[in-house]
Amino acid sequence: MQGHPDVINYLVTLLKGELAARDQYFIHSRMYEDWGLTKLYERINHEMEEETQHADALMRRILMLEGTPDMRADDLEVGSTVPEMIEADLKLEYKVRGALCKGIELCELHKDYISRDILRAQLADTEEDHTYWLEKQQGLIKAIGLENYLQSQM
């Protein structure tokens, strides 16, 4: 099925962002695991798996629309401390949210309602799961202090 070139190109852009999110969560999850922060490892590993699912859905849609996926991920921001890692992941989620909103508008403009629905589902996941959880972690660190937070994540 031939898709609109603008939609395909934007889906490719979104794919690169999802691949970056996957890779950033991957390295952060393994760092948490190495540091013995098991709860953070489990949560961020789960986020990595969800970003992989997002990338898969975009890739499948690009192929269905007769486009060519670009598997080169956007740049990563790898933190070196837990607060830096949470901040980097949150910045990435804010960026993804903005890109998804633009993509939804573009899909509606070109009457590609299936792609729009895929992006809307990813937007809901980004806002209601990923972003919300990361913001909550920042609030916990502020409320109980970093040492107590880290102890709670072992």
From Swiss-Prot:
Catalysed reactions, semicolon-separated: 4 Fe(2+) + O2 + 4 H(+) = 4 Fe(3+) + 2 H2O; Fe(2+)(in) = Fe(2+)(out)
Any one Gene Ontology molecular-function term assigned to this protein's record: ferroxidase activity
Chain sites annotated for binding Fe cation 1: 18, 51, 54, 127
Keyword Signal appears in the UniProt entry: no
Residue intervals of the Ferritin-like diiron domain: 1-145
Keyword set, alphabetical order: Cytoplasm, Ion transport, Iron, Iron storage, Iron transport, Metal-binding, Oxidoreductase, Transport
EC number: 1.16.3.1
InterPro entries: Bacterioferritin, Ferritin-like, Ferritin-like_diiron, Ferritin-like_SF, Ferritin_DPS_dom
One GO cellular component term: cytosol
Superkingdom, taxonomy of origin: Bacteria
GO biological process: intracellular iron ion homeostasis; iron ion transport
Subcellular location: Cytoplasm
Annotated residues for binding of Fe cation 2: 51, 93, 127, 130
Enzyme class: oxidoreductase
SUPFAM superfamilies (alphabetical): Ferritin-like
Subunit structure: Homooligomer of 24 subunits, arranged as 12 dimers, that are packed together to form an approximately spherical molecule with a central cavity, in which large amounts of iron can be deposited.
Purpose: Plays a role in catalase A (katA) expression; activity is required for optimal KatA activity and resistance to H(2)O(2). Iron-storage protein that is part of the heterooligomeric bacterioferritin (BFR) complex. The ferroxidase center binds Fe(2+), oxidizes it using dioxygen to Fe(3+), and participates in the subsequent Fe(3+) oxide mineral core formation within the central cavity of the BFR protein shell. Can store up to 520 iron atoms per ferritin protein molecule. Iron release requires only the input of electrons from ferredoxin NADP reductase (FPR), does not require Bfd. Does not bind heme.
Cross-referenced PANTHER family: BACTERIOFERRITIN
Family that this chain belongs to: Belongs to the bacterioferritin family.
Record-given protein name: Bacterial ferritin
Lineage: Bacteria, Pseudomonadati, Pseudomonadota, Gammaproteobacteria, Pseudomonadales
Gene behind this protein: ftnA
